[in-house]
Design a protein with these regions (language model features):
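Short linker/helix segments within small regulatory modules
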Residues: 12-20
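Cys/His-rich microdomains that often coordinate metals
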Residues: 10, 28-29, 66
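Thiol-based oxidoreductase modules, predominantly thioredoxin-like and allied folds used
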Residues: 35, 54, 65-73, 77-92, ...
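Short Cys/His-rich micro-motifs in 6-15 aa windows
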Residues: 25-33
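Short pre-active-site segment immediately N-terminal to redox-active cysteine/selenocysteine motifs
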Residues: 48, 55-58, 101
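Short cysteine-rich clusters marking metal-coordination/redox-active sites
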Residues: 3-6, 22-25
Length: 137
């Protein structure tokens, strides 16, 4: 991930304590990671609000929502973590959350599900939903 402040490229860990920071200037970085069935529990176990995107490469609406989630991860640095799970490659997570339709967005905190949104949503609707969940902290 390129630092929005100094441009330095950084590796962002799938799981960590706190939010990722730039190695050079220490600015908080957007936290957007891909995970697997094996790494899922570790990736979502954080007190920060986690938005999990259950998606597949062949899914048109999933491809439409991907840039929205990337933008939200940049706009809400330090407030949310976005975790992407390809359900074709990681069917156990999809099965665990009964994902029958994608994209399916799971909102989690400390590894616990707090809300779900099914289908592609425009940015303003997702942002409003996230704002409501952040206000409940």
């Amino acid at each position: 991930v390129a630092c929005p402040s100094c441009g330095t490229k950084n590796r962002v860990p799938e799981a960590a304590n706190g939010s990722p920071r730039c190695a050079s200037c220490k600015t908080e970085l957007p936290w957007l990671v891909n995970t697997t069935d094996a790494g899922f529990a570790k990736a979502v176990n954080t007190p920060q609000l986690v938005l999990v995107d259950l998606w597949a490469p062949w899914c048109g609406p999933c491809r439409m929502v991907a840039p929205v989630l990337e933008k939200l991860s940049k706009d809400l640095v330090g407030q949310i973590k976005v975790v992407k799970v390809n359900v074709d490659e990681n069917p156990m997570v999809a099965q665990q959350y009964n994902a029958r339709s994608i994209p399916m967005l799971l909102f989690m905190r400390n590894g616990e599900l707090v809300d779900t949104v099914i289908g592609a949503q425009p940015e303003h609707m997702l942002r409003g939903h996230i704002d409501q969940l952040l206000a409940k902290v």
